[in-house]
């Protein structure tokens, strides 16, 4: 069985974001790019994806995109791809505060009375980023804690971003109560960090980083992660996996992530596809 016929779930992408292109490459209209990305995802076996918000405007765009693409006649519906969204404030944007997110979340949850109409399936991405420090660290910690509480209050998945902040991330999750469905997005730690997150009850989501030559520690983490706690993602349009580095990423590339994980674990890619899809569906309730 070839990888192209396997079913995959891209648990984290940003299809609302503009795709970077070299200056000499014509930029397609955004709607055309989206339709093309959805069609290629379907061809690659990607049947489900979650579009992730990083701020109030980004989250509103993710929700609108997911809702629009799921309408009859929309590209996702036409290609047999189901899409959901998350609402969240990336640590880079922590200084903006969560008021806009709370209002958007309340409106969306009120709108989706029936589960079949639900678009919002998680809070995030949120967390701590001590590499860039675009927002002061105390503000990052405060806003992360508030979003942990939002996920717990509304029984939604929590999508966590952490970079060079493992100690504070783990401490804040432990102190505020880890939501039942917590996902460490784009996991880039090694075995020690993986065990700390797993001990909290979190799941680990691996991106194209797992294909990078210098990411042996990430592959080791993927190898030790329990199969029922493992998800795959693209983080599109970022972190394009080998051999497509240097081009915009998209959901159709998630099978490359799954294949790299399967190789690291010494198992069949089909088993990684089946498990990661089931895990993502359980985590997001879809």
PLM region spans:
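Mid-domain alpha/beta scaffold segments of enzyme catalytic cores
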Residues: 1-286
């Amino acid at each position: 069985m070839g990888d192209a016929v396997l079913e995959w779930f891209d648990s984290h992408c940003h299809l609302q974001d503009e795709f970077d292109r070299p200056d000499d490459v014509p930029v397609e209209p955004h709607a055309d790019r989206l339709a093309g990305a959805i069609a290629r995802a379907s061809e690659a076996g990607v049947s489900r994806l979650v579009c992730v918000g990083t701020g109030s405007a980004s989250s509103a765009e993710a929700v609108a995109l997911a809702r629009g693409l799921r309408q009859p006649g929309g590209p996702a519906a036409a290609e047999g791809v189901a899409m959901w969204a998350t609402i969240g404030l990336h640590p880079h944007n922590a200084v903006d505060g969560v008021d806009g997110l709370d209002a958007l979340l309340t409106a969306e949850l009120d709108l989706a009375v029936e589960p079949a109409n639900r678009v919002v399936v998680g809070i995030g991405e949120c967390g701590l980023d001590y590499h860039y420090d675009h927002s002061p660290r105390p503000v990052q910690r405060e806003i992360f804690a508030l979003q942990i509480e939002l996920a717990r209050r509304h029984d939604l998945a929590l999508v966590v971003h952490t970079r060079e902040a493992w100690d504070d991330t783990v401490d804040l999750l432990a102190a505020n109560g880890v939501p039942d469905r917590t996902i460490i997005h784009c996991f880039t730690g090694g075995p020690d960090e993986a065990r700390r997150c797993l001990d909290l009850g979190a799941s680990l989501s691996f991106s194209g980083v797992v294909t990078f030559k210098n990411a042996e520690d990430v592959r080791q983490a993927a190898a030790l992660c329990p199969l029922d706690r493992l998800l795959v993602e693209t983080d599109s349009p970022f972190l394009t996996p080998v051999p497509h580095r240097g081009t915009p990423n998209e959901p159709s590339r998630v099978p490359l992530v799954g294949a790299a994980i399967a190789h690291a674990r010494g198992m069949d890619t089909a088993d990684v596809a089946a498990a990661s899809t089931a895990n993502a569906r359980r985590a997001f309730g879809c």
